[in-house]
């Protein structure tokens, strides 16, 4: 008996049998040990062989365990085990059987055949489990498929389809695939190509997320339901698992062997299998080493002959990048283009999937939620495709509701945490003896009783509501199972079972569900089990930062009072504030053009009058933070080549991978305020880029991605015509001044650029009263900084007027005021604080004496 003539799996099993005997203190390795090792082998061939022969493997395993328990145990042998005479005889018999079959290597299944020829304990166990010599010989022939064992890895290559593919038709029969709604044209076209004589290989091409894999699942479901032409009736759809095919292929040629085994088995099936290769481009170059042949080239002969019915799926970009380069592979496939479904089709798809998601999350998905998911994802999520992005919204919204149902309600959690906090305080105060502590303890105990009572009441309500929801979940699961059983009975033609389910079980469950739902309909105070359009809007708002959720009363009031909020920081400039506020209100009320930015403005006026300040104020109003302001200083874009920094460098240039300054900022924050400061200083070519943004609300970056600007406010500032504003201030009306300024502007900017801007706003120069108002705002900011150091600041009206008077300059606006404040107030204050003249805790009074500021405490 030569071990080197055994297959790798058989050699491994003998090593495992030795370990088993050693662990149980047996002196000899018996046939029982080897049989147990073969049964326990990972991805071994004996377990599936016996199962295929109809032998009860679990019964055989328990019989083997009983026999192994009876074997004598020998201690103190020092780990010395050897093959028993019975096992040597069986292995020699295996060698004889292999020679008889003209095999070069002895495979594991011959051991079972050899064992059945004997009459020892192993033969008895096999016979009790239902194995006979004739049955095993038949099964071995089926498994081998007429092939000889010419390779030590021959056992690994058997049952290749079972190991390296997933049976989609089997999954469809079990009801594990999601229903496929619509897509009839694409499925029909796929079937049409599959029925060709040669090159009967469709490849589904479309953007990621449009449902290419779903079309193949739909085909599998139609085959199972018999809704296909005679040519492909009763065929199986197998999905190739590329991961399993490549995983563990350590040595050169192992991957090719596995793929060849798959192709050989497919050839034996004689056209009864349709192979589905998802991500088809992975086949090109897969397994390619130095001079090795890749998977794509191995498939070509089978594809061209028509031996292999193959359906591929890949994206447009990857098809161009990998498949089109290999013309010989491309011509063997027939393209089937899969377009993105419309919003109406997406709604139909979501309605079909609704029950599956309800069953998974144990929540109810309302129809308004489905409509909202399709319409909102189409409008606000621009970088992905329907129906995938709409399904994601439904899934995540249902998940959030489910999470709230499973976890403690926030209000109850808050009360319980407060109770713990109060108990800790109570323990600390109980150790104190003074009067104040005792009074505090009494108040605290009263509050604790109140909090515990509320928490107990809420906890009871929560438990009741949770129990009510659990009832409907069980009924829904039973109803889904009954419907699956009905489908199985219909396919099997079992009319008795069909009538029992259709007219008995299903109507009864539907009635129970209706009653349970009515009980649930009563107003729930803590739990929600319905996904509505509000939840969809919340999920979308969190993901994109775009406020699409329903406006609360407070937000409506805030929007109506928007001018007041903006005027807190922007003094004067009523026309500019009104224009911006109206644009934001139009957008939030849903009246703005969905294909353009929320608003685009050109702010014109002299320096220091509040053009940039209004943008900062708007960003703070919308996002509670000035960091949401995307500020681009256009003076940096004075050269022609600098334009590429906005949208990203073109291919072949340094920095191509990094993306553009403007496009990347908007991709990350689709809802933002974009400030293009000092726009007249930029190169004229910059405005060519802005034309597309202002008109269609989109821009293509250097990598060909479309960036959505439809949820941005675009503000450009310029100093053009500031001399006219200065001269005309006081004696020209606003409309006269605006027309004079626009006359200057038209000479600098092209008409097609100006024509696309929503509104050009002219800012007035600031008068003395405005400057005084701004001075009070800046002193409030200084007061806040001093408060951090425990100083309070009080300033008289005369001192404020003096600072405003010093800082007033009609040409330079409010900027000289800042310098005046630094020189007249901040510098002397800093010196006094450092000298220790002013003490913390006491108010600092600033007054005006003889035209100078005086600081005293």
UniProtKB/Swiss-Prot annotation:
CDD domains in UniProt: AAA (cd00009), RecA-like_ClpB_Hsp104-like (cd19499)
Region (NBD2): 555-765
Location of the region described as C-terminal in the Swiss-Prot/TrEMBL record: 766-857
Example of a GO cellular component annotation carried by this entry: cytoplasm
Domain Clp R: 3-146
Positions of ATP 1 binding: 206-213
Keyword field: ATP-binding, Chaperone, Coiled coil, Cytoplasm, Nucleotide-binding, Repeat, Stress response
One of the record's GO molecular function terms: ATP hydrolysis activity
Record-linked InterPro entries: AAA+_ATPase, ATPase_AAA_core, Chaperonin_ClpB, Clp_ATPase_C, Clp_N_dom_sf, Clp_R_dom, ClpA/B, ClpA/B_CS1
Subcellular location: Cytoplasm
Segments of this protein annotated with the region Linker: 341-545
Main location, first listed in the record: cytoplasm
Region (Repeat 2): 83-146
Annotated region described as NBD1, given as residue ranges: 159-340
Chain spans, region Repeat 1: 6-71
Disulfide bonds: none
GO annotation terms (biological process): cellular response to heat; protein refolding
Family matches, as Pfam families: AAA (PF00004), AAA_2 (PF07724), AAA_lid_9 (PF17871), Clp_N (PF02861), ClpB_D2-small (PF10431)
Assembly, per entry: Homohexamer. The oligomerization is ATP-dependent.
Similarity remark: Belongs to the ClpA/ClpB family.
Domain writeup: The Clp repeat (R) domain probably functions as a substrate-discriminating domain, recruiting aggregated proteins to the ClpB hexamer and/or stabilizing bound proteins. The NBD2 domain is responsible for oligomerization, whereas the NBD1 domain stabilizes the hexamer probably in an ATP-dependent manner. The movement of the coiled-coil domain is essential for ClpB ability to rescue proteins from an aggregated state, probably by pulling apart large aggregated proteins, which are bound between the coiled-coils motifs of adjacent ClpB subunits in the functional hexamer.
Record function comment: Part of a stress-induced multi-chaperone system, it is involved in the recovery of the cell from heat-induced damage, in cooperation with DnaK, DnaJ and GrpE. Acts before DnaK, in the processing of protein aggregates. Protein binding stimulates the ATPase activity; ATP hydrolysis unfolds the denatured protein aggregates, which probably helps expose new hydrophobic binding sites on the surface of ClpB-bound aggregates, contributing to the solubilization and refolding of denatured protein aggregates by DnaK.
NCBIfam families given in the database record: chaperone_ClpB, PRK10865.1
Name of this protein: Chaperone protein ClpB
Source organism (scientific name): Shewanella oneidensis (strain ATCC 700550 / JCM 31522 / CIP 106686 / LMG 19005 / NCIMB 14063 / MR-1)
